[in-house]
Amino acid sequence: MDFRIGQGYDVHALVPGRPLIIGGVTIPYERGLLGHSDADVLLHAITDAIFGAAAMGDIGRHFSDTDAKFAGADSRVLLRECFARVKAAGFSIANVDSSVVAQAPKLAPHIEGMRANIAADLGLPVERVNVKAKTNEKLGYLGRGEGIEAQAAVLLIKN
């Protein structure tokens, strides 16, 4: 068997006037993430990890932030399209592990919804998807609440 590990990362600034969407879950908060699409930092990191594991580049190569057709795009749609492309290339996903770093809001109440969305979009049992919520211990721009970061690792299997 051919195993491939991918690592993904994304960060977006928090700004007023936008919804906060993480892992496909809309989270009540006074600010949301700034971006060309819905700026779902977690799904962008996972998408990058999947493309990376398949040696197919990154999210920007497939869904450019300069392309008007992706303006306001639902990142769940992009994740499903990413999965379709790597599946067509002969890969399946073994598991996903991820972390979201946010000083606020508290993400723990939303983790199971995020896991369920990711599992559904990737055709995986929820037991193969993990999402962890972390803070930056009030250090740096994340600790000051200026943005939210996500990191993801994915294991692909070449069929």
UniProtKB/Swiss-Prot annotation:
Gene: ispF
Keyword hit for Transcription: no
Pathway in which the depicted protein is active: Isoprenoid biosynthesis; isopentenyl diphosphate biosynthesis via DXP pathway; isopentenyl diphosphate from 1-deoxy-D-xylulose 5-phosphate: step 4/6
Site positions for Transition state stabilizer: H36, T135
Protein name from the UniProt record: 2-C-methyl-D-erythritol 2,4-cyclodiphosphate synthase
Gene Ontology terms for molecular function: 2-C-methyl-D-erythritol 2,4-cyclodiphosphate synthase activity; metal ion binding
UniProt xrefs under InterPro entries: MECDP_synthase, MECDP_synthase_CS, MECDP_synthase_sf
Annotated keywords: Isoprene biosynthesis, Lyase, Metal-binding
Pfam families: YgbB
Binding sites annotated in the UniProt record for 4-CDP-2-C-methyl-D-erythritol 2-phosphate: D10, V11, H12, H36, S37, D58, I59, G60, F63, S64, D65, T66, D67, R144
